[in-house]
A protein has these predicted regions:
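Nucleotide-activated donor-binding/catalytic signature segment of Leloir-type glycosyltransferases, i.e.
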Residues: 252-275, 285
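Conserved acidic donor-binding segment of nucleotide-sugar-dependent glycosyltransferases
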Residues: 326-333, 342-347
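Glycosyltransferase donor-sugar binding loop
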Residues: 20, 211-212, 216, 239-254
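Aromatic "clamp/platform" in nucleotide-sugar-dependent glycosyltransferases that forms part
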Residues: 291
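Acceptor-binding helix/loop patch of EC 2.4 sugar-transfer enzymes
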Residues: 40-66, 107-152
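Carbohydrate-associated surface elements
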Residues: 167, 189
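Conserved donor-binding/catalytic core segment of Leloir-type glycosyltransferases
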Residues: 201-219, 225-228
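Short hydrophobic beta-strand element within catalytic cores of glycosyltransferases
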Residues: 308-311
Length: 406
């Protein structure tokens, strides 16, 4: 998004906590401090005397040790402090789902704020609770998701929210109690220059690819493995490539052993964008079996690469895939196996689906379109802000046609 906004002629700063993102060289990265405890070998020993001078540092450390996830809250405190000094440099602040208390203070200071909610994390929490083996694990799930109390409160008070699909819009209204008039839809974009077809990359004859956090129930990997077991009877040489990390001793590893699929499934992680793109390009078919997605980025990326896609109807996936792929009921391994089998057996269908998928992403989900829609919304928000200030000061000029979002 930041690259697309810069391409459109706007000035963009990205304020980020750790781990810091890799950005277009034209985008200014402003690094917020933090303990980065998820990259530290022994978090219990990460606290230093200087951190005791910062409530955010101490709270982040204490929360990590007690099973919490404090980063949305502590990031908000740090950003609020930064913008107290530098907020005058910006026309608008766009939050990427931290939904922290600091946003309300920033908005009250007079700086326009818009927040993206990709989907309400209450969905993730419920799926994790449903999959929890015992009360102890359920307690840990609730503790880790404790930040949701803050996110729900903040979402209800923010004036401007962006979401990335109609399904997410419905879920935000239902799960977070946000008023419909607060929400504006802007579909996510796919980088169609990076994620693109390449005829020089040979498509494997019997390879399914998926992306998944191996033991995250939301992603539906278990459903795909069940489908894979059935398909191997028809396609003995069939293999599955999972872009994700296999947790030793976890539920996925146990299911692999139960289904006798250890030799048919490969996990890869820590790969570059170039490697990811080539995995999409070389797959016979890409499976997206998620039980829920607020958008469905892997499906869009695969389609942009010209790969045929079979997806579940979990969340917003049907909005992304449309009629360019095959959509089956979420959680139904038999339906998933049947659809994958159709594609694996028909090279003509593979080619047609690949071409239709690429065209759909180019027409509906490119970043230039997403950026254009967001800038239009930014200008609408800025216009409201100008009117509000004029009402407070008695001014009447409402021309904001030259306003620039940053």
């Amino acid at each position: 998004l930041s690259k697309a906004l810069v391409d459109a002629g706007h000035s963009v700063d990205v304020i980020s906590g750790q781990p810091y993102p890799e950005l277009d060289e034209r985008v200014n990265l402003i690094k917020m401090p933090g303990l980065n405890l998820y990259e530290v070998e022994k978090p219990s020993r990460a606290l230093r005397p200087k951190h005791l001078l910062s409530w955010a540092d101490f709270f982040e450390w204490l929360s990590k040790l007690t099973g919490g996830f404090a980063e949305p809250y502590t990031f908000g405190r740090r950003v609020r402090k930064y913008l107290r000094q530098h907020g005058h440099q910006y026309d608008i602040v766009h939050d990427n789902q931290s939904l922290c208390y600091g946003l309300l203070d920033i908005e009250r200071s007079g700086l326009p704020v818009v927040a993206t909610i990709h989907h309400p994390i209450t969905r993730d929490r419920q799926l994790a609770l449903d999959a929890a083996p015992d009360w102890r694990f359920r307690l840990l799930v609730r503790r880790w998701h404790n930040f949701l109390n803050m996110q729900i409160k903040v979402s209800r008070k923010l004036r401007h929210i962006v979401t990335v699909s109609r399904q997410s819009e419905r879920d935000i209204i239902e799960q977070f109690g946000v008023a419909p008039e607060q929400i504006h839809l802007v579909y996510n974009g796919i980088d169609t220059e990076i994620f693109s077809p390449n005829n020089k990359v040979q498509r494997q004859p019997l390879r399914i690819m998926t992306t998944s956090s191996a033991d995250q129930p939301l992603k539906g990997l278990g459903v795909l493995l069940q489908a894979m077991a059935g398909l191997r009877e028809r396609f003995p040489e069939l293999e599955l490539l999972v872009v994700g990390r296999l947790r030793k001793g976890g539920a996925t590893e146990k299911l692999l052993q139960k289904l006798n699929l250890q030799d048919a499934v490969q996990f890869v992680s820590g790969i570059s964008n170039e490697e990811l793109v080539n995995h999409y390009r070389s797959a016979t078919v890409v499976a997206c079996p998620s039980l829920y997605e607020g958008f469905g980025l892997p499906a869009g990326e695969a389609m942009a690469c010209g790969a045929p896609v079979v997806s579940s109807d979990g969340g917003a996936l049907p909005e992304v895939v449309g009629d360019a792929g095959i959509v089956v009921p979420a959680g139904d391994s038999n339906a998933l196996a049947e659809a994958l089998g159709r594609v694996l057996a028909d090279k003509s269908l593979q080619a047609d689906m690949g071409a239709q998928g690429r065209a759909r992403i180019e027409n509906k989900f490119c970043w230039s379109l997403a950026a254009s829609n967001l800038v239009a919304y930014y200008r609408e928000i800025l216009g409201e802000s100008v009117v509000q200030q004029q009402n407070e000061t008695g001014l009447v000029d409402t021309d904001v046609s030259g306003a620039e979002a940053a």
